[in-house]
Amino acid sequence: MQKTLKRYFPIFVLPTLIAFSFAFIIPFVMGVYLSFCKFKTITNAQFVGLENYIKIFADKDFVNAFGFTLKFSVVSIVTINVFAFILALALTRKIKGTNLFRTVFFMPNLIGGIILGYIWQQMINAVLLKYETTLVANPTYGFWGLVILMNWQMIGYMMIIYVAGLQNVPTDLIEAAEIDGATSLQTLFKVKIPMVMPSITICLFLTVSNSFKLFDQNLALTAGAPSKKTAMLALDIYNTFYGRNGYEGVGQAKAVLFFIVVAVIALGQLVLTRRKEVEQ
């Protein structure tokens, strides 16, 4: 049986490998090459070396977008995971209606980013108009509007992962801690959190990557206004590639650099958190 599987393994893998190559590997390699070119279309690409990458660091919009994205990501990662974990703790207690609450908290994650952006734009502006201002009048309003939107969308999803982790904590350990006289806080920090580190690793990875890659919510909520001060990296790349004539190569270079930054940060976070995981 094993010999038969090994014999036909390439036949089953080959279609997937071909599809993956055409859908990801070839476009990725082509994208990296085009980041070193000046082009209108891929048929008239002219190699210009590092010129596009030099222009990136002279672009104030990119520098501002990078700083804004970094600040937004730090705040979102902390708030999403803290609130999601608190909700998970509450919903793993023996209270009525936990399944209903889990469903309600998870539902915002099912709504598209563009729709969420416009919904929250209307809601926040309805409040701000009472004070004779709008969401795009001040970068601070746009920043916190994006944070609120991101939290509302992601907390329910992260909560489900934390709930699964908390439910897998051995009850023997919790009972042993209680017998030893540990308080609720001591049990939380010494038993539960170390045991749910795999869930924390997953949630941190997802929030890090999603925070940095945020695009459609940013486009719908503020579109970078005022004066591109609330534009995040993904939106800045879009504006450069499609909105600035002759800057297609620069936009592609920004996309490659963006991929490297997100990959390094996400992989670094995975390494750091996995070191703290406890074998069960």
How would you label these PLM feature ranges?
Residues 2-280:
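A structural signal for multi-pass alpha-helical bundles of membrane permease subunits
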